[in-house]
From Swiss-Prot:
GO terms for biological process: positive regulation of cell division; positive regulation of microglia differentiation; regulation of cell population proliferation; transforming growth factor beta receptor signaling pathway. Latency-associated peptide: Homodimer; disulfide-linked. Latency-associated peptide: Interacts with Transforming growth factor beta-1 (TGF-beta-1) chain; interaction is non-covalent and maintains (TGF-beta-1) in a latent state; each Latency-associated peptide (LAP) monomer interacts with TGF-beta-1 in the other monomer. Transforming growth factor beta-1: Homodimer; disulfide-linked. Transforming growth factor beta-1: Interacts with TGF-beta receptors (tgfbr1 and tgfbr2), leading to signal transduction. Interacts with EFEMP2. Residues 214-238 are annotated as: Bowtie tail. Transforming growth factor beta-1 proprotein: Precursor of the Latency-associated peptide (LAP) and Transforming growth factor beta-1 (TGF-beta-1) chains, which constitute the regulatory and active subunit of TGF-beta-1, respectively. Transforming growth factor beta-1: Multifunctional protein that regulates the growth and differentiation of various cell types and is involved in various processes, such as normal development, immune function, microglia function and responses to neurodegeneration. Activation into mature form follows different steps: following cleavage of the proprotein in the Golgi apparatus, Latency-associated peptide (LAP) and Transforming growth factor beta-1 (TGF-beta-1) chains remain non-covalently linked rendering TGF-beta-1 inactive during storage in extracellular matrix. Coiled coil: none annotated. This is Transforming growth factor beta-1 proprotein. It comes from Cyprinus carpio (Common carp). Residues 1-22 form the signal peptide. Transforming growth factor beta-1 proprotein: The precursor proprotein is cleaved in the Golgi apparatus to form Transforming growth factor beta-1 (TGF-beta-1) and Latency-associated peptide (LAP) chains, which remain non-covalently linked, rendering TGF-beta-1 inactive. Transmembrane segments: none annotated.
Length: 376
């Protein structure tokens, strides 16, 4: 039976060789055409993700005004978080579930300033967070961010994060302390969701040094913003890199996520060269002003969207009994088009800072930067 199936498949493919010869219209790949189509696709994609029917009109007077420091801080923090969380190409997510299509609005909430803070508490105004987010939003991601500026010498140590519950605290997770000035991030998505279901006006975290031998070990880290330094002005307080949470959320009606099918895939993070004909990632920089004619996006000025190109000459796995037939078909019909590589595997998000009329906004656009491609 196995031999008969193999012969039947072989006959079908060899028959297709003669048929495809008459229909073959292979032509050199027009990279400029692909770029133009990719740019136009991105134009529509960004507007769609932001739920805009057309590009916003630029308010020249508003554009020339000073941008609020708070929004610049939100944008910069989002960029830093994305850089830290970017998946290395050599460790792609296997069988990923697609992120929500629509843009996620980003909000930044800093801790309550305290004159003294010996127990290293991080208090947040939950009432303010709830009112800012509103009721009809889905919280997608929440990250607690701390800047470590002074670190202990000697052996490697850990910083532990606890959730404050009344007079007690519950352990959440820990991070190894870097030996350099660096931001630390903790995923506190579920914690904030729980807080928003309660009635308390304030909720908080506590930081502790991990030490099994000495639980009361002195806190040796310096984290700016844990206490209010005497003499701080309002401007300095705003610009101080205080501990904060970044909340990414989207409206209830924008949660149109779909799960990807599980299947075997061949993936590549290979960057295309002039001689590349196999599946690869081709670099494409989009300048918002030059390529799209947009002045309403303040930051960034552009980004590397990239795209997948090339062909997948061998897409069946060695486990498939018909792989020999495919190889034989390619041998007899070398001019036939191989399966195109047009499917991104790993895509990174893009935060943008833009104007809508007289309003400034910071939002995160999911799946905008192609990092790796796959043959499927």
């Amino acid at each position: 039976m196995r031999v008969e199936s193999l012969l039947l498949a072989l006959q079908c493919l060899l028959g297709f060789v003669h048929y495809s010869g008459a229909l073959s219209t292979c032509s050199p790949l027009d990279l400029e055409l692909i770029k133009r189509k990719r740019i136009e696709a991105i134009r529509g994609q960004i507007l769609s993700k932001l739920r805009l029917s057309k590009e916003p009109e630029v308010d020249e007077e508003k554009e020339s005004q000073n941008i609020p420091a708070e929004l610049i801080s939100v944008y910069n923090s989002t960029v830093e978080l994305n850089e830290e969380q970017a998946a290395p190409p050599e460790q792609p997510k296997e069988d990923p579930v697609e992120e929500e299509y629509y843009a996620k609005e980003v909000h930044k909430f800093t801790i309550k300033l305290m004159e003294k803070n010996p127990d290293k508490f991080l208090w947040f105004n939950i009432t303010d967070i709830s009112q800012t987010l509103g009721l009809n939003r889905i919280i997608s991601q929440v990250e607690l961010r701390l800047l470590i500026t002074t670190f202990p010498d000697g052996s490697e140590q850990r910083l532990e994060l606890y959730q404050v519950i009344g007079n007690k605290s519950r352990y959440l997770e820990s991070r190894f302390i870097p030996n350099q000035r660096k931001w630390l991030s903790f995923d506190v998505t579920q914690t904030l969701k729980d807080w928003l279901q309660r009635s308390e006006a304030e909720q908080g975290f506590q930081l502790k040094m991990a030490d099994n031998c000495d639980p009361q070990k002195t806190f040796q880290l310096k984290i700016p913003g844990l206490v209010l330094v005497r003499g701080d002005t309002e401007t300095l307080a705003v610009n101080m890199p205080r501990p904060h949470i970044l909340v990414m959320s989207l409206p209830l009606d924008g949660n149109n996520s779909s799960k990807s099918r599980r299947k075997r895939q061949t993936e590549t993070d290979q960057v295309c060269t002039d001689k590349s004909d196999g599946c690869c990632v081709r670099s494409l920089y989009i300048d918002f002003r030059k390529d799209l004619g947009w002045k309403w996006i303040h930051e960034p000025s552009g980004y590397y969207a990239n795209y997948c190109t090339g062909s997948c000459s061998f897409v069946w796995t060695s486990e498939n009994k018909y792989s020999q037939v495919l190889a034989l078909y390619k041998h007899h019909n070398p001019g036939a088009s191989a399966q195109p590589c047009r499917v991104p595997q790993v895509l990174n998000p893009l935060p943008i800072f833009y104007y809508v009329g007289r309003q400034h906004k910071v939002e995160q656009l999911s799946n905008m930067i192609v990092k790796t491609c796959k043959c499927c």
